[in-house]
């Protein structure tokens, strides 16, 4: 690791305050030129620990940068991950205030709701499908505590993979009842089609991303628990949202999900 414990704590505090005050900070990679990936995960886990001490509960996890184009843009060869707390996960038709975020964007994903524990390494796609009770259409609201989304890979890792909120649809399906690779999705903003995509864009199959995360977390001594929600990554490019927007999204075979921004 390139940062001292004091620098790591300073960086974690800066991100935490940015989220609370909605005042973004300069990229950590600029303020701490020696910041590496392990430092970045150390910063993320420091803030996770603080939230757990404050009484919050981890409800699941997210995978970011599952699209090869995004990884190429940041010069990395693997995705990243973040933690999802109970306070972040909401049901469809959720309403948000734009004032609660800095520069929010939305993505479309197929959320995996687990019925069994999973602990890597050694987890396969088949293991993931057997352990999944339901796959739901979901909107992930992402937000960067780094000003102007000027992020390097280490910045978004430290910033909990830019996680903010997850909105889950009400229907869904068993992943054993459809071929998720072929499921297409669409996201509308104020009635206008903004983005379309296919789940094959998520590492070939969203369950591949879930297996990757189970194995990555397993090497850190973390396991999925029954009831966890795992967000495998978006099938579309992120769409900016602002006050007054109404978002509708749908995934073939899974249903739809909505949110409005007040």
Region roles according to the model:
Residues 2-205, 242, 246, 254-262:
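Catalytic-core "active-site belt" of small-molecule-metabolizing enzymes
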């Amino acid at each position: 690791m390139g940062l001292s414990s004091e620098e790591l704590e300073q960086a974690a505090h800066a991100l935490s305050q940015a989220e609370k005050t909605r005042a973004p900070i300069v990229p950590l990679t600029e303020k701490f030129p020696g910041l590496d990936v392990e430092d970045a995960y150390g910063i993320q886990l420091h803030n996770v620990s603080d939230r757990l001490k404050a009484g919050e509960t981890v409800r699941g996890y997210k995978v970011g940068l599952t699209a090869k184009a995004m990884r190429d843009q940041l010069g990395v060869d693997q995705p990243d991950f973040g933690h999802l707390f109970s306070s972040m996960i909401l049901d469809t038709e959720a309403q948000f205030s734009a004032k609660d975020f800095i520069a929010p964007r939305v993505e479309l994903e197929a959320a995996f709701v687990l019925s069994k524990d999973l602990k890597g390494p050694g987890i396969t796609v088949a293991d993931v499908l057997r352990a999944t009770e339901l796959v739901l259409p979901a909107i992930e609201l992402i937000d960067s505590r780094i000003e102007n989304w000027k992020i390097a890979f280490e910045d978004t890792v430290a910033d909990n993979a830019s996680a903010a909120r997850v909105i889950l649809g009400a229907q869904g399906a068993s992943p054993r009842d459809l071929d998720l690779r072929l499921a297409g999705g669409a996201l509308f903003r104020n009635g206008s089609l903004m983005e379309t995509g296919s789940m094959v864009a998520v590492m070939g199959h969203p369950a591949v991303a879930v297996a990757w995360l189970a194995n990555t977390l397993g090497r850190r001594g973390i396991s999925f628990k029954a009831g966890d929600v795992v967000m495998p990554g978006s099938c579309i490019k992120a769409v900016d949202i602002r006050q007054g927007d109404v978002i509708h999204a749908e995934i073939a075979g899974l249903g739809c999900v909505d949110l409005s921004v007040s």
